Amino acid sequence: MAKGQSLQDPFLNALRRERVPVSIYLVNGIKLQGQIESFDQFVILLKNTVSQMVYKHAISTVVPSRPVSHHSNNAGGGTSSNYHHGSSPQNTSAQQDSEETE
């Protein structure tokens, strides 16, 4: 589980530190918006007009409103080439399909 944390923690920490507005899509399709106030192994505290504790197992996707620079300590570099800024989870597969056909 430590390997999964090596990408997740720096990404969430950069979003928290830079106070980047995020959209969080839950597995049931609900979209939550706000800023990440804090997080731990199991939950993210999302602040908007109120603070909400969101369990990570209920999250499908975290979409920042702007690009963030996050660095991982792993040897692979830590950034994902599959990240499409500004795309919603519903549009991601359509974008990948169009990129493959070009």
Curated annotation (Swiss-Prot):
Residues 70-96 have a biased composition (Polar residues). RNA chaperone that binds small regulatory RNA (sRNAs) and mRNAs to facilitate mRNA translational regulation in response to envelope stress, environmental stress and changes in metabolite concentrations. Also binds with high specificity to tRNAs. Residues 9-68 form the Sm domain. InterPro entries: Hfq, LSM_dom_sf, Sm. Homohexamer. It comes from Shigella dysenteriae serotype 1 (strain Sd197). The gene is hfq. GO terms for cellular component: cytosol. It holds the Pfam family Hfq. GO terms for molecular function: RNA binding. Belongs to the Hfq family. Residues 63-102 are annotated as: Disordered. GO terms for biological process: regulation of DNA-templated transcription; regulation of RNA stability; regulation of translation, ncRNA-mediated. This is RNA-binding protein Hfq. Keywords: RNA-binding, Stress response. It comes from the Bacteria.
